[in-house]
């Protein structure tokens, strides 16, 4: 299914907040999303799709939909809006919320960014969406804001996220911050140095093409070997 990744806008923040509430225990007020988008409009990204045949438990319950009362009507009708949809036929399936470090106590630090939140709807996971969102954000931080490094926090229990950050995106674990989250769970504090030449999106496009070619070669070799074995068995039977 086609997935489109683009910069997040103010028009996306209701759907971004909905995805956050739907998937993560760390939640934010609407104004915090607005602060990110208005202050660093190039840094945050959303993933959307117009192919809507992948609907299951992630779909909003009727009680979760937003109610809108229509003014100027005689019967005072209300309609329910699905907050997963950015527009008719366009559904948000993931986002990454990013900012530059604006801590006044760290003004002497070189320019650096922070990954505030990353979320992908459950039905659309294991498709590389989170990795693509992150790579776009890292490239934007370096190219647009000249960030020298980026930081984030991740729950110790979140093995999938840790694998993405550490093994796929080459973040390093700096420390363990005790009771970082409201429920008392510890967090890994992670950091990645940003080098523009390593972050070029084309690098990873070529890598994926090569991986696909290698997989195709492996499949062809496997099919050829299977044919040879079958032919050998047939010769023995004859």
Swiss-Prot record:
Keywords from the named record: Acyltransferase, Cytoplasm, Transferase
Organism: Saccharomyces cerevisiae (strain ATCC 204508 / S288c) (Baker's yeast)
GO CC terms, sorted: NatA complex
One Pfam assignment: Acetyltransf_1
Taxonomic placement: Eukaryota, Fungi, Dikarya, Ascomycota, Saccharomycotina
EC number of this enzyme: 2.3.1.255
Function: Catalytic component of the NatA N-terminal acetyltransferase, which catalyzes acetylation of proteins beginning with Met-Ser, Met-Gly and Met-Ala. N-acetylation plays a role in normal eukaryotic translation and processing, protect against proteolytic degradation and protein turnover.
Alphabetized GO MF terms: identical protein binding; protein N-terminal-serine acetyltransferase activity; protein-N-terminal-alanine acetyltransferase activity; protein-N-terminal-glutamate acetyltransferase activity
Subcellular location: Cytoplasm
Xref: InterPro entries: Acyl_CoA_acyltransferase, Ard1-like, GNAT_dom
Other facts: Present with 3310 molecules/cell in log phase SD medium.
Family: Belongs to the acetyltransferase family. ARD1 subfamily.
Descriptive protein name: N-terminal acetyltransferase A complex catalytic subunit ARD1
Catalytic activity: N-terminal glycyl-[protein] + acetyl-CoA = N-terminal N(alpha)-acetylglycyl-[protein] + CoA + H(+); N-terminal L-alanyl-[protein] + acetyl-CoA = N-terminal N(alpha)-acetyl-L-alanyl-[protein] + CoA + H(+); N-terminal L-seryl-[protein] + acetyl-CoA = N-terminal N(alpha)-acetyl-L-seryl-[protein] + CoA + H(+); N-terminal L-valyl-[protein] + acetyl-CoA = N-terminal N(alpha)-acetyl-L-valyl-[protein] + CoA + H(+)
């Amino acid at each position: 299914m086609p997935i489109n990744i683009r910069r997040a806008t103010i028009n996306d923040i209701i759907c971004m907040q909905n995805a956050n509430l739907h998937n993560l225990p760390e939640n934010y007020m609407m104004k915090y999303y607005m602060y990110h988008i208005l202050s660093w409009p190039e840094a945050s990204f959303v993933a959307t799709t117009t192919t809507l045949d992948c609907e299951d438990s992630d779909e909003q319950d009727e009680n979760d939909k937003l109610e809108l009362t229509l003014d100027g009507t005689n019967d005072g009708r209300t309609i329910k809006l699905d907050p997963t949809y950015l527009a008719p036929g366009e559904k948000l399936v993931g986002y990454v919320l990013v900012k530059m470090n604006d801590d006044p106590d760290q003004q002497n630090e070189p320019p650096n960014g922070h990954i505030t939140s990353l979320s992908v709807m459950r039905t659309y996971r294991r498709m590389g969406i989170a990795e693509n969102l992150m790579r776009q954000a890292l490239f934007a931080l370096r190219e647009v804001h000249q960030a020298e490094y980026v930081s984030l926090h991740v729950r110790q229990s979140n093995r999938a996220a840790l694998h993405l950050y550490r093994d796929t995106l080459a973040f390093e674990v700096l420390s363990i911050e005790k009771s970082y989250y409201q429920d008392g769970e510890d967090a890994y504090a992670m950091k990645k140095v940003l080098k523009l030449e390593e972050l070029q999106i084309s690098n990873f496009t070529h890598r994926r093409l090569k991986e696909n070619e290698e997989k195709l070669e492996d499949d062809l070799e496997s099919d050829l070997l299977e044919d040879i074995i079958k032919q050998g068995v047939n010769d023995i039977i004859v």
